[in-house]
Amino acid sequence: MKKISEQKRKHLENLVDDQGIIGALAIDQRGALKRMMGKYKEVTAQEISDFKVLVSRCLTPETSAILLDPEYGLAAAENRAQTSGLLLAYEKTGYDASTPGRLPDSLDVWSVKRLKEAGADACKFLLYYDVDESEAINERKKAYIERIGSECLAEEIPFFLEIVSYDANNSDSASKEYAKVKPHKVIEAMKEFSKDRYNVDVLKVEVPVNMNFVEGFGTESLYSQDEAQAFFNMQSEATQLPFIFLSAGVSATMFQETLKFAKKAGSSFNGVLCGRATWADGVLPFVQQGAEAAVAWLETTGKTNVEELNQVLRESAVSVFEKIQ
């Protein structure tokens, strides 16, 4: 059971629903969103900001919180529903592919103090982590996360650490080869950053298996359903912290089925920060037809995606306050 300050708890209460579950919308994408829009036309920073505003305005009445970035997302933060809490991302988008290690970097003109002043109920930081990479690289990452944990402790707002695992020797995270090692990569990273020294309050993590390689889910079976369920159990046992799942760009249907599978496996996950699975198909009408068409999609299909996800969460996730004092 993790103990947090009264102030941190108040902020955390702003991010959960009435069952203590985090049903949050993630649209802190910057590079990825620019690429999604850029498939159809040249996009401006204003258009990226405008799309985030529409997503926030249309969908936050149905979500417990929204995750945004301070670069393109502050207008969207102001346009969220009053019932929806706010997480702000602290990391720079992407990583320098020319340098080994996918090293973390925070936004130049931001600090946790400034995120809090901008209205954030929590600081989110994305870390790419390969537990089997060199000690020289991983020690730098550990020290970096210690610093952010200390900042969040000083400012008394929750620290959400998003961990995206990878293999330094295999750049294809969708491959069968990576699927074989993914459970080890995800679970060991969670064990490391659950240590008290990092002052992490909530982990945002991947599901421990690539569901496309689970019997009955994908075209090729690498794991039986029993084996996959065992990994979900191992993941829950790897941390005493609340943890939530990221959607990793899969479809809305696949994400919902994955959460049902996690529940069946006995996972004690505490919610989601769901991004592209919710809003990705709204990009095309926005870029090709404008705001009105995007709103029409968001108010129908987008809202349905959120409502269906919320129903699955109510039936499968566990309150964060079962793990926090």
UniProtKB/Swiss-Prot annotation:
Signal peptide: none annotated. Pathway: Carbohydrate metabolism; D-tagatose 6-phosphate degradation; D-glyceraldehyde 3-phosphate and glycerone phosphate from D-tagatose 6-phosphate: step 2/2. GO terms for molecular function: 6-deoxy-6-sulfofructose-1-phosphate aldolase activity; tagatose-6-phosphate kinase activity; tagatose-bisphosphate aldolase activity. SMART domains: DeoC. It is an enzyme of class 4 (lyase). Keywords: Lactose metabolism, Lyase. It comes from the Bacteria. Its EC number is 4.1.2.40. It catalyses: D-tagatofuranose 1,6-bisphosphate = D-glyceraldehyde 3-phosphate + dihydroxyacetone phosphate. InterPro entries: Aldolase_TIM, DeoC/FbaB/LacD_aldolase, LacD_aldolase, Tag_1.6-dipho_adolase. Belongs to the aldolase LacD family. HAMAP family: LacD. This is Tagatose 1,6-diphosphate aldolase 1. It comes from Enterococcus faecalis (strain ATCC 700802 / V583).
